Regions:
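Gly/Pro/Ser/Thr-rich low-complexity, intrinsically disordered segments predominantly at protein N-termini
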Residues: 1-185
């Protein structure tokens, strides 16, 4: 006879408490998704390089319009606090974790985490109404863009895949142009 295994779900307050009391360490690579503590893959050299170069490019072009955060949390709701690789968000959120209404763009860099990013994180971002998400797929060397969230269906209406030579621009800042070839060696 099969027995179902129960899981313990956490809210954001409890998740933060685990860090405060030392159960989760400062260097632990974890995030809260759908009330579950997810252990993130270690950051590889290619992943780190792309995040660093993209953060530099986006920071250089910001002109005071937004802030860039690398691998910092976004407070989605009481059960979701993911740590995207990069976030472009409104300057009004200085001093706190950005929330979905503050976010212009989320970028996930996927070296070994493509399935997790597509199946677990994209639905959370869509349900929160995050307007735009990019997944930079280092396995296929492409940028997948997700736009026009359907919150009830936890998906995006518009998805496109751009090859490494294509120029991609965030919806909120069409003057910014990103080419994957400029970020990978």
């Amino acid at each position: 006879m099969a027995t179902d295994i129960a899981t313990r779900r956490f809210n954001v307050r409890e998740f933060h408490k685990l860090a405060e009391v030392g159960i989760l360490g400062e260097d632990d690579r974890v995030e809260l998704l759908d009330g579950q503590i997810m252990i993130l893959a270690p950051i590889g050299e290619n992943h780190r390089t792309v995040v660093d170069l993209l953060a530099e490019l986006l920071t250089d072009q910001r002109k005071g319009r937004y802030l860039v955060a690398a691998q910092n949390p976004v407070l989605i709701d009481d059960e979701d606090e993911p740590q995207p690789d990069l976030v472009l968000y409104d300057r009004a959120a200085i001093g706190r974790h950005p929330t979905p209404t503050d976010v212009f763009l989320i970028v996930e860099v996927s070296d070994t985490s493509l399935g997790y990013d597509q199946r677990s994180k994209i639905p959370v971002y869509a349900s929160a109404g995050i307007k735009e998400v990019w997944i930079i797929d280092l396995g296929s060397y492409c940028i997948q863009t997700y736009r026009d969230p359907y919150t009830a269906d936890r998906r995006y209406a518009t998805t496109e895949t751009h090859d490494r030579k294509s120029l991609v621009s965030p919806l909120a800042f069409p003057d910014i142009r990103v080419r994957l070839n400029d970020l990978v060696q």
